[in-house]
């Protein structure tokens, strides 16, 4: 049985004895299908009442966070989406405050947001609003107040709009069915003791709306002199796990039947079979609607019962439709209903770099280095969307007849928003960075390593760490490996290119380039500092070597002469 994210929620805000309400509350659970509909966002803010822009700051923060968060790229992780939105909000609020000479007109607000996707909660917090959780009989405040207690009351030490920099507390944890969450402003929790808060929130005989009203009334009975706002979220049901959230797709359609030339599938006529292997089948097809040629790709029938492989295929289609870049193969969104599982891509005429290398085993070094620029541009476009390709190799780099390089095949790709709590496997072990074999965190530097292996192979026909590399699975095994200079296999390779490859191929990701643009820079022009580091000491300082050698010979001759004279 498939379970969905199901919650009950209620919220209430009251101005209390004040002339205006500077608090803001909001929640959003999109309707429909896909990953967005399984994401709940709840936000609460308390505008600084001593600042005239406090109310605007609170309302803007809640409203814009709930709208902008769901408008971020689907490939971003929740953490990235939340931070990007809050950084933009903070810049705007801080900028508004700079328009005034009086600090009392600043736009300052506290902010606390709870985002739930699948079985995981994410919390973004700044200021002294609070998030509480009731789990069973355990009542816990999950946030820390960013405030100092003074004789004039609490003084915020952190708030949205206070500084152009922002310091947001972030945490994530598992959610359980039966959890109840309370978000409150200080007009509630500064006046109601924690035990009373717990008793009201835990009152199962009352509706959530009634509990919110009771919290407001209780704060008044405790002489709260501030605005009073609260939100209660009751977790009714959760997905079985996060796996089924991995794609923003409906239930997967069936695999198409075995296709042959002349067959028709959803108004695509099979013109030719281009490739067939254990993983997929690739066909050249003509669209009966626009009469253009396209590539139609389907999973192999061998994978009909392989859920992970079918998800990888869906992920390839999902990513391809959302990444648009001239150096990445175009994947087209459906223009009509699809009755089978397949994807449609642009028709590229040319060959993979694997085939090209077989035909050009002695290609000029500069020709191969020129391939790096479009590949790096494509990878940077992916990385900006928190997407790792994870299968960079000559087979997945396509050289068109016009001389352009296109990055293809996203079947092994990892996406920030989809990779949360998922362990996605990389592609070919010969090209994969050590992080995959060791099971440690990876980032764009893993793709950098794979690209460097690919360039090394195109230049030399060999692998940089030999054939044993793919079998390494432990740190000890990797430590036994040593990098073989590309110059040993191809004497036409300049030392500075070999040095750049060597750094990108460091087994320790911390020793690789921080950014792919730096790698490209060192591939295209000599980096004297890097080349110097990569040379043996003798090559770095030949004059000093011979000076020291002569000095040692002189000393040895003096010693011999002295010993002879003493006889």
Residue ranges and their predicted role:
Residues 377-387:
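Protein kinase catalytic-loop region centered on the HRD/HxD motif
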Residues 324-332:
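Conserved HxN/HPN-centered segment at the entrance to the catalytic loop
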